[in-house]
Amino acid sequence: MTPFFIALQFLTRLKLVNQTEWTVEDFGKSVIAFPYVGLIIGLILALLYGVLSPFIPIMPLMLIIVVSEFLLTGGLHADGLMDTSDGLFSGRERERKLEIMKDSRIGSFGVVAFVFVTLLKWQLLAAIPTAEFIPMALIMMPLMSRWSMVFSIRSYPYAREQGMGAAFANLAPKHVITYNTISTFFMPIVLLIIGILLYTL
């Protein structure tokens, strides 16, 4: 199973290959494909916006976009946000914070953080002043966020010696930041050129 399909199945609900068991090595190497998965998420959101924008006002449409992203990704980012918020704002010592983050139950800080970030994302998308910029914003948002995941994995030490994050941190290719930074920079440029060509034809 290629790194791309592993990353796609891990970061989204899209399962082009039905496989649930991976080797630790393959799982760690899938980091290199994270931005490409972000690009796919962004293209789906931009397509959804293009289809619905003639019929739905901007405020409810952006709410649909935010909810669609949540459903498309399975809420993976939201789960991480809530766990992190519960741990960081618990006021406990380091080891206890890590235990709280690992706990599957959601605390009050996690709920507040999720609601706040969701409302903020909704309002920021709705506040984009020019409608022509919205599709590119919807593409760049998941693309850059998945690139930032790769950057964090390779740049910062993992808090635990074992776990899913350790596989990413220890087995991700050493050149992954350089490769993903270059590809992440050029992907939107290529899309912009294609969009301009299609618009002018």
Go through each PLM region and give its residues.
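Hydrophobic alpha-helical transmembrane segments
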Residues: 1-74, 92, 98, 103, ...
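Hydrophobic "anchor" residues on beta-strands that sit immediately upstream
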Residues: 79
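Catalytic P-loop NTPase motifs of RecA-like helicase/translocase cores
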Residues: 88-90
